[in-house]
Regions:
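GH16 jelly-roll
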Residues: 3-180
């Protein structure tokens, strides 16, 4: 659906869902007010609590040399319905340059890397609930403009259009998963 609008946002995603493995994405992302580029993983469905994995997330209020990685829990957990918790980490990297962003999805552990260096690691016991072994995830590459979060930084209409430049996306299946 295309609406009569001054701006559009977009996303592409994998058709297939993945449970375990290693993703590498070589990309450079825009850094201007009002943009919200993200490389993230959305849950297929599954338990009452589902997870979200943000490999890269940025909004224009952040400095160009900072980005966030994050793990979210959504749904019913901790005795509450419609609950949401997040476990973010700020990472020093200039996303306006090409970098290789890596997510290793392992049993009981998520490892985030930039250019081969571990920048964040979350293990099953580190957070309140662990849905990441219970369902599959698809990769989403998204670029939004405005909205409640990114728009709170102001908008830079004169810097449009913007885009995410992707050199490649690679997926490596774990050897132990090949026998399933």
């Amino acid at each position: 659906c295309i609406r009569d609008s001054l701006y559009t946002s977009g996303r592409i995603f994998t058709k297939q869902y993945f449970r375990y493995g290693k993703f590498e994405i070589k990309a450079k992302l825009p850094v201007t007010a009002g943009v919200w580029p993200a490389l993230w993983f959305k849950a297929n469905s599954g338990p009452a609590c589902v997870g979200e994995i943000d490999l890269v997330e940025y909004i224009g209020c952040m400095k160009a040399e900072k980005m966030n990685v994050n793990v979210h829990l959504w749904g019913t957990f901790g005795g509450k319905k419609n609950n949401h918790k997040q476990y973010p980490r700020s990472v020093a990297v200039n996303i306006s340059n090409y970098h290789i962003y890596t997510l290793e999805m392992l049993r009981g552990k998520l490892v985030f890397k930039v250019d081969g260096k571990v920048v964040y690691e979350v293990k099953k016991g580190d957070i309140e609930y662990w849905p990441f072994d219970e369902t599959s995830y698809r990769l989403m590459i998204a670029l939004s403009y405005g909205g409640t979060w990114a728009g709170s930084c102001g908008l830079a209409d004169n810097s449009l259009p913007q885009s995410i430049k992707v050199d490649y996306v690679k997926y490596y299946r774990l050897k132990e998963e090949c026998n399933d």
